[in-house]
């Protein structure tokens, strides 16, 4: 049975079973590979996407659960001609080392900045509590989010 969901503002159809994790539909059916499989238990944040502007862990979210919601992935931010402010700030602050966590970090940061455009450092850290970086670049990630928000680092 076909399932149609809105991804990055466009309707997309998959033949996946309703219980299939959203992450696998995004990656395998729609070839949107920014969200990553990290733990499979919603503990690391590598799979974070936005569903109706709220961060969700796509590795444990059944595709059927997103229904008529809009799913936004990193690929839906900015364009090849003009990066989203968060993407540019992560580059400018050299926030990535291996880069595996970065899509999830950016999506969590986007949700934060959409809700709170000028967050404090404590609010940024709290918003990222579900996103892990094994390389230890959390300080650069926080600086990048501050830069994107126009908050002095």
Predicted regions and their residues:
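Signature of N-terminal electron-transfer/Fe-S-associated modules in redox systems
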Residues: 1-153
């Amino acid at each position: 049975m076909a399932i149609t969901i809105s991804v990055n503002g466009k309707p997309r159809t998959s033949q996946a079973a309703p219980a299939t994790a959203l992450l696998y539909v995004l990656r395998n059916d729609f070839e949107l590979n920014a969200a990553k499989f990290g733990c499979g238990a919603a503990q690391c944040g590598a799979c974070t996407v936005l569903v109706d502007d709220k961060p969700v862990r796509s590795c444990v979210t059944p595709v059927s659960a997103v229904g008529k919601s809009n799913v936004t992935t990193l690929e839906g931010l900015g364009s090849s001609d003009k990066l989203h402010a968060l993407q540019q700030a992560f580059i400018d602050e050299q926030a990535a080392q291996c880069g595996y966590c970065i899509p999830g970090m950016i999506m969590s940061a986007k949700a934060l900045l959409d809700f709170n455009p000028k967050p404090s450092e404590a609010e940024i850290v709290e918003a990222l509590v579900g996103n892990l970086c094994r390389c230890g670049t959390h300080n650069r990630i926080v600086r990048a989010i501050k830069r994107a928000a126009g908050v002095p680092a």
